[in-house]
């Protein structure tokens, strides 16, 4: 997500997403801040709050990646784009999507609906999902530095908590 352009392998094995909430933390390295700016609030909430992993083609349709290429051509396509031999621009989401992300009333409405759904599914027992919701909703209107600072604090708090420790131990087996 920190790249200008992202090229992914169009292969059945490729999965793209931010699964950290399934381990009781939230996406780090700017993920909870960058994804909303890249694909908008509704799609990023779906990806981050569920921790779902998407096939490359689905990720491309959602705007998570800018180009997909068959595995045998992936390196060549990426090099051509990096060297300027092939033009590739990020998809523009359009003014409606931009307006929705920048509208505080819409963000508040989306947040309240998402919070209701989260509470219904988790009964508030998974704090990472609620923290991720707050991070994603705030992302379009705050600076990268502010978002990174808040994200680091949230990850540190969540990673040292009992829910994260329990989920990681389940993951490890």
Regions found by a protein language model. Give the residues of each.
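NAD(P)-dependent dehydrogenase/reductase Rossmann-like domain
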Residues: 162-173
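Conserved catalytic core of Hanks-type protein kinase domains
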Residues: 38
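Glycine-rich beta-to-alpha active-site loop
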Residues: 1-23, 27
């Amino acid at each position: 997500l920190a790249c200008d352009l992202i090229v992914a392998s169009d292969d059945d094995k490729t999965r793209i997403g931010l699964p950290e909430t399934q381990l009781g933390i939230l996406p780090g390295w700017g993920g909870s801040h960058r994804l909303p700016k890249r694909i908008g609030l509704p799609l990023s909430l779906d990806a981050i709050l569920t921790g779902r992993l998407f096939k490359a083609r689905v990720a491309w349709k959602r705007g998570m990646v800018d180009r997909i290429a068959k595995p045998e051509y992936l390196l060549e396509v990426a090099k051509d784009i990096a060297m300027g031999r092939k033009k590739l621009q990020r998809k523009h989401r359009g003014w409606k999507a931009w307006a929705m992300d920048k509208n505080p009333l819409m963000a508040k409405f989306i947040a309240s609906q998402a919070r209701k759904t989260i509470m219904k599914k988790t009964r508030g027992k998974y704090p990472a999902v609620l923290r991720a919701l707050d991070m994603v909703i705030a992302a379009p209107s705050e600076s990268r530095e502010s978002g990174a600072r808040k994200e680091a604090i949230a990850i540190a708090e969540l990673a040292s908590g009992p829910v994260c420790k329990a989920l990681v131990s389940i993951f490890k087996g």
